[in-house]
């Protein structure tokens, strides 16, 4: 236990919380340009081909971003919006692309959970 005198001379240090999404720089989303669109395999015990894109953000960061939903229209030089949110079985992927904004289309034929995939209400 520190004495009052010690605390007067040198106060207690605050614990600095480290951000999970440093590239967003305290913004809710960021815009960027796809530099590479590819598929990758998840960690054990899962098995799939997960759709991922490398994005160069407007603030200069280059990050990997997961493309959720079935099917997408992204290619190199597509402009995308990314949000935070990691993919647990893909190491190094800490961001999600926002479906239905900028160059990213919504998921076709989606009827439930549409707001998460940028799909309009069917008529």
Curated annotation (Swiss-Prot):
GO terms for biological process: translation. InterPro entries: NA-bd_OB-fold (IPR012340), Ribosomal_uS12 (IPR006032), Ribosomal_uS12_bac (IPR005679). The keyword Coiled coil does not apply. GO terms for cellular component: small ribosomal subunit. PROSITE patterns: RIBOSOMAL_S12 (PS00055). GO terms for molecular function: rRNA binding; structural constituent of ribosome; tRNA binding. The modification 3-methylthioaspartic acid is found at residue 89. Residues 111-123 have a biased composition (Basic residues). Pfam families: Ribosom_S12_S23. Residues 100-123 are annotated as: Disordered. Keywords: Methylation, Ribonucleoprotein, Ribosomal protein, RNA-binding, rRNA-binding, tRNA-binding. It comes from the Bacteria. With S4 and S5 plays an important role in translational accuracy. Belongs to the universal ribosomal protein uS12 family. Part of the 30S ribosomal subunit. Contacts proteins S8 and S17. May interact with IF1 in the 30S initiation complex. PANTHER family: 30S RIBOSOMAL PROTEIN S12 FAMILY MEMBER (PTHR11652). This is Small ribosomal subunit protein uS12. It comes from Pseudomonas syringae pv. tomato (strain ATCC BAA-871 / DC3000).
